[in-house]
């Protein structure tokens, strides 16, 4: 039993060992399968910290890494899935496929052994032009074994149209098998042939110069014996000039790599869209042309400065002229446009590159293979874009260093200073353009994120939609907190634009105008910005129309200072509402675009005329220099074509100057006494109105004859062609002066043409209102009428179209004038209706006052008949105060009342009252009651008079007709009270 148990136990242990070994083998197989990815057989190794990952180009800091012994690739464990297929496995598969294809073709190979075998490059490479441009020197050597391939041209030459169908099918299968090559393999074979060869072909034009500038500095590039002969200042200056040329050469190399290697490979090998490639490399062709030309000029100047018999030793003494020509004029404008576009799209280009690199494996493989070489390792796409962006910022530093170490002539230093100023101006313009382009792109982004139905009501202006944003320029934007009337804070996006402040609020990933208690569009007209006391982040925005105050808060104190500064600057330069309306209709927008196009055409016309006059003057000066031996003529005034400057001449002054030049030219050609009164009807005979006779155009006032037989004889003909003044100084020849006057006349006439064009555009763009417009229309109509009275003449079709356009424009102007007159008539009719209503009210008030006056006169008449005044002695007669009499109606008393004037010789007031009533019966009755002036006596005991003397105030007329009505009852009570004591006394 023990033996049986031992055997059983041994057998059990044996089975367990086999099971454990099988499990270990399965684990090893699973681990091996897990390491096997994309044809790579990865194994685990331990590496140092200096080993770089092939996939991500980063150092492998972990203790373990993966390596493929087939292709010797070391990567991170996490990067194995991103690695491309193993190249050795691909080559084995490719050789097997080609061997199979060649075996199938051997049965139908009809090519003779004497015929040389050709390489079917069109069937192998998908882009023949790219291979020819980059690998022309290596065309005879193939990277793949094609010894058993067939020439399609030779095969086709041995088969006619009557060949069997089976042979043709075999031929098509063989050629299709060659065309089925993967595009990624084509890229690999391209780069495997050597990036050095590609680079050498790219820089073939500057190969010699690149070797000459391989040293780090000028001191190391020249011979030591030649270096010891130079001064220290010259050595420093030449080092900087050498650095300028060397960095320019490197910059051209970077541009060529971007243009010829990356862009061409992406277009022809990867078959990317042209728009995508243009987004990666914007304006590289323009930049390459600009800097290649500049580098050629620098290298030519270096060759001119070489010492005789040497190819290394040189000293450049003159460089400022090249710098001025490069950074001024058309060249500077080209650089400004190219760098503005490139730098503004720098961020988008890098973002697009990262997206392509992350999602496209073929793109990853292309970039890795290109940058594998040592010469291109530091020239990836991102590095090249960054280098091109930073290049323009290096010029001011280099030129400033050259200027600091220049101790030569003053002219060179002055030119270097000018060049430095031009470079700084160019850099400032590029920065401004980049800022504007970035703000424009930001505005487009905001516009596309806005809700199309979003509108903000503007008081008395209408709705403000998102289309109004595109009319303006975005100056500044940012997120702020808007404090509402309830004390809550709302997150808003504030846009500072040309003439408005716009508040936007984000809702459902779209921008809308916030529906709050205040308008979300604020005009910059008379806008006031104030800081909030005791708050570092708050500020007030006080608007005038409508009068509102906004309280907003920024993220920091610096942001508030920035907002205050930019808002105040925008308020100072805010355009008026006449030039830039708040809300623009479609018709107004169309007219504005037309005006802008007209202004651009005027600028282009002025520029063309300026260039034309300059060429004419240059040609004339060249002819004069040849004839007179180097005598240069003065140039035209600089402000002739400057329409924006204050030196811009007016059309009238230009015309007067042109007439003066014509008269001077006439005096030079035919003499000062000849009157050129030629008419187109009879140019030979001219009648002098003073003498009544005929005068020939060749006879002067002194009777001297002039002959014009195809040439010009000047009025002063001396035996000696040279003329001298009284002091013996040489005078200018008449021919030179005539040519100079001709140049002046030519420039003045073209300047007049430019001024007239600009004036027409200005008058059409800004039509005056009222009589000036009617006068303009009348002048236009009179010109048309005079042109019509000249007589019928054949009119060209383009002229008919022009006249039709003019008539249509005049018709539109007349219609606009008619509408304006109608609006004016409606306003006048409304005013007339208001005046008529006021007139009716005044007539009613006048009738009421007349009725009250009649009633008062009737009461006075009744009172006078019932109570006659008692007879008194002359000494007891007292003068009546104006208040004690029956007062007439309100208007009559107000117009006739004269306050009493104090007399100098008496202590009492002389109450002489003069009453002029508009009612004649009332005035007669008043005279009867008061009596004659001789019978009036002064009453010094009147208490009312005494009170008036004590008061000393002037009597003021009543304020309203109601006061007059209330005062009419006063005289009756006074007379009744005065009558009682009179009766008692009597």
Swiss-Prot record:
Pfam families: PH_16, RhoGEF. Residues 920-939 have a biased composition (Basic and acidic residues). A zinc finger (Phorbol-ester/DAG-type) spans 39-86. Residues 1-30, 687-707, 862-887, 893-912, 920-986 are annotated as: Disordered. It is found in: Cytoplasm, Cytoskeleton; Cytoplasm; Cell junction, Tight junction; Golgi apparatus. The modification Phosphoserine is found at residues 109, 122, 129, 133, 137, 143, 151, 163, 172, 174, 177, 645, 691, 696, 711, 782, 886, 896, 932, 940-941, 947, 956, 960. Residues 473-572 form the PH domain. Its main location: cytoplasm. The keyword Acetylation applies. The modification Phosphotyrosine is found at residue 894. GO terms for molecular function: guanyl-nucleotide exchange factor activity; microtubule binding; small GTPase binding; zinc ion binding. PROSITE patterns: DH_2, PH_DOMAIN, ZF_DAG_PE_1, ZF_DAG_PE_2. Activates Rho-GTPases by promoting the exchange of GDP for GTP. May be involved in epithelial barrier permeability, cell motility and polarization, dendritic spine morphology, antigen presentation, leukemic cell differentiation, cell cycle regulation, innate immune response, and cancer. Binds Rac-GTPases, but does not seem to promote nucleotide exchange activity toward Rac-GTPases. May stimulate instead the cortical activity of Rac. Inactive toward CDC42, TC10, or Ras-GTPases. This is Rho guanine nucleotide exchange factor 2. It comes from Canis lupus familiaris (Dog).
């Amino acid at each position: 039993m023990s033996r049986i148990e031992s055997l059983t136990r041994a057998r059990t242990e044996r089975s367990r060992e086999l099971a454990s070994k099988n499990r270990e083998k399965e684990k090893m197989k699973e681990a091996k399968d897990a390491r096997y990815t994309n044809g790579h057989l990865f194994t685990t190794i331990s590496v140092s910290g200096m080993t770089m990952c092939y996939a991500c180009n980063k150092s492998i800091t972990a203790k373990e890494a993966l390596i493929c012994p087939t292709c010797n690739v070391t990567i991170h464990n996490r990067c194995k899935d991103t690695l491309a297929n193993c190249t050795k496995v691909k080559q084995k598969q490719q050789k097997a496929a080609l061997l199979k294809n060649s075996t199938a073709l051997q049965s139908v190979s009809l090519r003779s052994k004497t015929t040389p075998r050709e390489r079917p490059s069109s069937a192998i490479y998908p882009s023949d032009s790219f291979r020819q441009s980059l690998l022309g020197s290596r065309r005879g050597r193939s990277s793949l074994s094609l010894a058993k391939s067939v020439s399609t041209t030779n095969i086709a030459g041995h088969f006619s149209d009557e060949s069997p169908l089976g042979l043709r099918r075999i031929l098509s299968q063989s050629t299709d098998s060659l065309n089925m090559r993967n595009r990624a393999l084509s890229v690999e074979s391209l780069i495997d042939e050597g990036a050095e060869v590609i680079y050498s072909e790219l820089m073939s034009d500057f190969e010699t110069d690149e070797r000459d500038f391989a040293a780090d500095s000028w001191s190391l590039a020249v011979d030591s014996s030649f270096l010891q002969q130079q001064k220290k200042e010259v050595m420093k200056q030449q080092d900087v000039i050498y650095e300028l040329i060397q960095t320019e050469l490197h910059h051209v190399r970077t541009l060529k790599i971007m243009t010829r290697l990356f862009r061409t490979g992406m277009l022809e090998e990867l078959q990317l869209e042209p728009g995508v490639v243009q987004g990666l490399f914007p304006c590289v062709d323009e930049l390459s042309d600009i800097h290649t030309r500049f580098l050629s000029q620098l290298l030519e100047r270096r060759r001119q400065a070489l010492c005789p018999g040497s190819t290394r030793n040189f000293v450049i003494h003159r460089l400022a002229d090249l710098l001025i020509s490069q950074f001024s004029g058309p060249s500077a404008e080209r650089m400004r446009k190219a760098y503005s576009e490139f730098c503004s799209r720098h961020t988008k280009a890098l973002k697009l590159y990262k997206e392509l690199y992350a999602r496209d494996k073929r793109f990853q493989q292309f970039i890795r293979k290109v940058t594998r070489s040592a010469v291109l390792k530091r020239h990836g796409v991102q590095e090249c874009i960054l280098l091109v962006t930073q290049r323009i910022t290096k010029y001011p530093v280099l030129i400033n260093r050259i200027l600091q170490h220049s101790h030569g002539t003053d002219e060179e230093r002055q030119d270097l200073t000018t060049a430095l100023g031009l470079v700084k101006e160019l850099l400032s313009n590029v920065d401004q353009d980049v800022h504007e382009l970035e703000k424009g792109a930001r505005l487009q982004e905001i516009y596309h994120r806005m809700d199309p139905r979003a509108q903000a009501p503007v008081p008395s202006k209408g709705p403000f939609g998102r289309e109004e944003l595109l009319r303006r320029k975005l100056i500044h934007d940012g997120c702020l907190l808007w404090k509402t009337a309830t004390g809550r804070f709302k997150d808003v996006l504030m846009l500072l634009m040309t003439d408005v402040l716009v508040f936007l609020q984000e809702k459902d990933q779209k921008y809308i105008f916030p529906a709050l208690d205040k308008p979300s569009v604020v005009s910059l007209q008379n806008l006031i910005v104030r800081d909030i006391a005791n708050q570092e982040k708050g500020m007030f925005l006080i608007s005038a129309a409508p009068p509102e105050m906004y309280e907003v808060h920024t993220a920091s104190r610096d942001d508030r200072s920035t907002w205050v500064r930019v808002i105040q600057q925008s308020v100072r330069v805010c355009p008026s509402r006449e030039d830039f309306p708040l809300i623009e209709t479609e018709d107004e927008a169309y007219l504005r675009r037309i005006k802008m196009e007209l202004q651009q055409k005027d600028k282009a016309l002025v520029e063309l005329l300026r260039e034309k006059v300059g060429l004419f003057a240059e040609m004339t000066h060249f002819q004069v220099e040849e004839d007179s031996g180097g005598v240069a003529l003065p140039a035209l005034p600089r402000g002739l074509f400057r329409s924006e400057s204050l030196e811009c001449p007016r059309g009238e002054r230009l015309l007067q100057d042109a007439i003066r030049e014509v008269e001077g030219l006439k005096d030079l050609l035919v003499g000062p006494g000849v009157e050129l009164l030629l008419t187109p009807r009879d140019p030979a005979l001219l009648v002098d109105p003073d003498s009544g006779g005929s005068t020939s155009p060749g006879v002067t006032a002194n009777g001297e004859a002039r002959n014009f037989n195809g040439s010009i004889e000047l009025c002063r003909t001396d035996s000696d062609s040279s003329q001298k003044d009284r002091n013996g100084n040489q005078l200018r020849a008449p021919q030179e002066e005539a040519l100079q006057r001709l140049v002046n006349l030519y420039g003045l006439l073209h300047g007049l043409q430019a001024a007239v064009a600009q004036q027409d555009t200005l008058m059409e763009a800004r039509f005056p209102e009222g009589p000036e417009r009617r006068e303009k229309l009348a002048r236009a109509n009179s010109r048309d009428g005079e042109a019509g009275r000249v007589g019928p003449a054949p009119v060209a079709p383009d002229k008919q179209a022009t006249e039709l356009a003019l008539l249509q424009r005049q018709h539109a102007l007349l219609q606009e004038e008619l509408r304006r007159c109608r609006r004016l008539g409606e306003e006048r009719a409304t005013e007339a209706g208001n005046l008529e209503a006021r007139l009716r009210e005044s007539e009613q008030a006048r009738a009421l006052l007349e009725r009250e006056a009649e009633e008062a006169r009737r009461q006075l008449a009744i009172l006078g008949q019932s109570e006659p005044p008692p007879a008194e002695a002359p000494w007891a007669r007292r003068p009546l105060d104006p208040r004690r009499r029956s007062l007439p109606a309100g208007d009559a008393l107000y117009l006739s009342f004269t306050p009493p004037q104090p007399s100098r010789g008496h202590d009492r007031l002389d109450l002489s009252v003069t009453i002029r009533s508009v009612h004649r019966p009332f005035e007669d009755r008043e005279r009867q009651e008061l009596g004659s002036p001789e019978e009036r006596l002064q009453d010094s005991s009147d208490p009312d008079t005494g009170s008036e003397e004590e008061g000393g105030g002037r009597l003021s007329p009543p304020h309203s007709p109601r006061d007059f009505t209330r005062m009419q009852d006063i005289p009756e009570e006074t007379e009744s009270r005065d009558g009682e004591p009179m009766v008692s006394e009597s």
